[in-house]
Amino acid sequence: MRVLAIDPGLTRCGIGVIESSNMSMVGVGVLKSSVEDSIELRLMDIDSQIREWITLHNPDVIAIERVFSQQNLRTVMGTAQVAGVALLAAAQSNIKVVMHTPSEVKAA
């Protein structure tokens, strides 16, 4: 099973692909959007980059880190918006999604 994992973030969004059959890392990267751009352009840019990874790696499932409460409301809003973009890209690609909290990811 091939898993595409996303750690959502508006300025920097972590992304990686693992092959669970042999526990190997297929790819890892950081998706970036420019702070100079408007929010809608930034989200569109992140969406495009996520879709490129989906097309390139053909994952069976997408794992997205669940947004948790942060001190900075602006940061949590951007993170939640990127998570929404990732959920939409997965749904439109007919790929199952699993959501995990940061503590669940660290425990695994």
Question: What is each stretch, according to the model?
Answer:
Residues 1-108:
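Phosphate- and other anionic-substrate recognition elements at nucleic-acid/protein interfaces
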